[in-house]
Amino acid sequence: MNGDRRDPTSPPRLLVAASGTGGHIFPALAVVEQLPTWQIEWLGVPQRLEAKLVPDRYPLHRVAMSGWQGSPWQKLGSLVQLARATLQVRQILASGQFDVVLTTGGYIAAPTILAARSLGVPVLLHESNCLPGKVTRWLGRFCRLVALGMAETAEHLPGAVTRVVGTPVRAEFYQPQPLPADLPIPEGDPLIVVMGGSQGARGLNRLVAACAPAWLEAGAWIVHLTGGSEVGIPSHPRYRAFPFRADVAALLQRATFAISRAGALSLAELWATATPAILIPYPFAAEDHQYHNALAFVGRGGGVVMRESEANLDLLRQTALAWLAQPQVVAQMAANLKATAPPAASKAVARLLQEICRDSAR
């Protein structure tokens, strides 16, 4: 396809294939913000999160695609759907004369990688998780490059060309942010930020609700991002609950520590702000990948990991109380994260896309 390119002096054209959850979409958005002169279009799946986030910024193409779970007959149907989606993506790529593709994995990545390979369009695949997803494991070798959020991922991708870059987060996570005016937390008071995540927040919220009275009694403020799930703890002037907030960067920069799920994007935000964390992985994540993410984060000296269980209720309560009582321990964990944090990954991935375009034009 590249042999029939349009005017070579025109801006590079990028197709972004990122769909479903914030963990797939927000890193891609952070990357394309670094490419203001490029012509960018987006590929997603109908009725997913990208339908709310993307159309005001970039043209959005939609292709039906789902996962591989289910009976043999359902899997056969998935193969038929994959073939149909690959042909649709091939048509989008050919008619749009795209120079390069960026995908962040997930369902939409499979037809995108296959279609791009059939046309000779180079693909940069970014994998945020420590344990890569099935599409990355199966098709990473067909990509020009697989950019990794964590170094540990490379061992799972034999045959793929990999580069460790970190996981892209929005620029504000690297820039000092003022604490929002609606959170009048006095300087020096400890702050615990709880991030339930967009999926499976209910179990984590239940544990935190049971522990919060002890932390409040110890003098902490708690900002609890519930993900929309009810938590039901008594009202308290130093406890603030919100379904979501857009100013997570400011909260994490101010936090003493966080209590969080272990999605790759959440960990990247904690890493970028050097925020120590008690990690409670979502127990129903595919292939338990959040637990693997958490182990990688903890291995850098940034916190502890515990399973979601009522049996761990007292462990969670006492761990947070110990951290509140030992600020020097928390400070050391923050220093560990600062020392191991990669540079801004969004810029690194943008540079890799630029390199791929230059190499392909030769």
UniProtKB/Swiss-Prot annotation:
It is found in: Cell inner membrane. Belongs to the glycosyltransferase 28 family. MurG subfamily. It comes from the Bacteria. The keyword tRNA-binding does not apply. UDP-N-acetyl-alpha-D-glucosamine binds at T21, G22, G23, N129, R170, S198, Q290. It comes from Synechococcus sp. (strain JA-3-3Ab) (Cyanobacteria bacterium Yellowstone A-Prime). It is a peripheral membrane protein. Keywords: Cell cycle, Cell division, Cell inner membrane, Cell membrane, Cell shape, Cell wall biogenesis/degradation, Glycosyltransferase, Membrane, Peptidoglycan synthesis, Transferase. InterPro entries: GlcNAc_MurG, Glyco_trans_28_C, GlycoTrans_28_N. Pfam families: Glyco_tran_28_C, Glyco_transf_28. NCBIfam families: murG. Its EC number is 2.4.1.227. The keyword Transferase applies. The lineage of its organism: Bacteria, Bacillati, Cyanobacteriota, Cyanophyceae, Synechococcales. Gene3D superfamilies: Glycogen Phosphorylase B. Cell wall formation. Catalyzes the transfer of a GlcNAc subunit on undecaprenyl-pyrophosphoryl-MurNAc-pentapeptide (lipid intermediate I) to form undecaprenyl-pyrophosphoryl-MurNAc-(pentapeptide)GlcNAc (lipid intermediate II). GO terms for cellular component: plasma membrane. Its main location: membrane. It is an enzyme of class 2 (transferase). One of its GO terms (biological process) is cell wall organization. GO terms for molecular function: UDP-N-acetyl-D-glucosamine:N-acetylmuramoyl-L-alanyl-D-glutamyl-meso-2,6-diaminopimelyl-D-alanyl-D-alanine-diphosphoundecaprenol 4-beta-N-acetylglucosaminlytransferase activity; undecaprenyldiphospho-muramoylpentapeptide beta-N-acetylglucosaminyltransferase activity. Pathway: Cell wall biogenesis; peptidoglycan biosynthesis. This is UDP-N-acetylglucosamine--N-acetylmuramyl-(pentapeptide) pyrophosphoryl-undecaprenol N-acetylglucosamine transferase. It catalyses: di-trans,octa-cis-undecaprenyl diphospho-N-acetyl-alpha-D-muramoyl-L-alanyl-D-glutamyl-meso-2,6-diaminopimeloyl-D-alanyl-D-alanine + UDP-N-acetyl-alpha-D-glucosamine = di-trans,octa-cis-undecaprenyl diphospho-[N-acetyl-alpha-D-glucosaminyl-(1->4)]-N-acetyl-alpha-D-muramoyl-L-alanyl-D-glutamyl-meso-2,6-diaminopimeloyl-D-alanyl-D-alanine + UDP + H(+).
